[in-house]
């Protein structure tokens, strides 16, 4: 188990007590352990991707918090979003069908060194039995859901996906990859490696995570809906990230430090933003709004062009016992 620093001067404790609000926001623990960074996944984005990794802080500058389609505040930042209710949808100020620059986030395209200008989010959770789950969260400002019979469905503003490496006594044992409403899990040793680190593939538009490149069909019969992956730009989340610890017993986050832009901005931002249990994008549009339509074909599709934005890391079962987010159906694959 990762050690904790428990000693503190009485005077410092008094000072922190007197400043309760900033104390909670700036609570800190140990930095992200080196064994986590050394075994963190690296990911290939699709070579034809159009909606690249985004910085959550930048995303919020284009949002207005709404509940029941009415604004509850004029704006929102990482420092304030954690205080919003679970009924809140962070709603875009712009018409996203016009694909403004913040939606496509081309600035987040990884460079030749595999660094993205958009910080990833790493969340560490200690558990019984020497277990440490390291979650690597990837954020995008837009999800392009795909096409069924050449009709677009499932687009939404905001997109959270994640991978998770489970460590036991500091050794990596398993890898979980989120994809749409589910995901897949593998023993760590069978995963493809790049310089000893697991290599994953992120689908174009939907940003679902897979262990192998190629086509991955899902959700609908007759292979009507498929994700595409290949060895496009490589993304190393450890080069730019915000790091945190999560205590599942108290449901509290604390700052662990980070790297590059994420590490520089994190001290002022704190950890409270991770408490936001609302949606990181627009509520599902009404029919005809922004070209919205819905189609119900029995046994084929019951979906709308635009759906509501997703919840964030706090809703991803961080305290899970099994490796998978959905614990009642978790198979750990021993081959690719």
Residue ranges and their predicted role:
Residues 166-170:
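Short beta-strand micro-motifs enriched in acidic
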Residues 21-159, 174-336:
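A domain-level signal for the mature, folded cores of soluble proteins
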């Amino acid at each position: 188990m990762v050690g904790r620093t428990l000693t503190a001067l009485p005077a410092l404790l008094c000072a922190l007590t007197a400043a309760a609000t900033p104390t909670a926001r700036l609570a800190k623990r140990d930095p992200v352990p080196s064994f986590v960074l050394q075994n963190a996944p690296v990911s290939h984005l699709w070579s034809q991707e159009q909606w690249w990794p985004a910085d959550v802080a930048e995303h919020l500058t284009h949002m207005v918090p709404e509940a029941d389609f009415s604004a509850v505040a004029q704006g929102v930042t990482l420092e304030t979003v954690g205080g919003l209710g679970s009924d809140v949808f962070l709603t875009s100020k712009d018409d996203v069908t016009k694909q403004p620059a913040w939606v496509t986030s081309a600035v987040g395209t990884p460079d030749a060194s595999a660094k993205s200008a958009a910080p990833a989010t790493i969340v560490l959770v200690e558990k019984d039995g020497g277990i440490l789950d390291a979650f690597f969260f990837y954020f995008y400002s837009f999800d392009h859901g795909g096409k069924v019979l050449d009709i677009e469905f499932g687009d939404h503003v905001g997109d959270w996906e994640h991978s998770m490496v489970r460590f036991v006594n500091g050794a990596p044992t398993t890898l979980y990859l989120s994809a749409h409403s589910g995901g897949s899990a593998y023993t760590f040793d069978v995963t493809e490696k790049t310089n000893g680190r697991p290599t994953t593939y992120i689908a174009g538009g939907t940003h679902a995570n897979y262990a192998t490149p190629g086509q991955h069909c899902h959700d609908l019969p007759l292979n009507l809906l498929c994700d595409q992956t290949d060895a496009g730009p490589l993304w190393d989340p450890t080069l730019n990230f915000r790091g945190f610890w999560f205590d599942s017993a108290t449901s509290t986050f604390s700052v662990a430090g980070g790297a590059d832009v994420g590490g520089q901005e994190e001290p002022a931002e704190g950890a409270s933003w991770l408490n936001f249990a609302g949606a990181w994008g627009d509520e599902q549009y009404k029919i005809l709004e922004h070209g919205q339509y819905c189609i119900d074909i029995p046994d084929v599709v019951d979906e709308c062009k635009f759906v509501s934005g997703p919840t964030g890391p706090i809703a991803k079962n961080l305290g899970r016992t099994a490796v998978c987010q959905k614990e009642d159906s978790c198979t750990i694959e021993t081959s690719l």
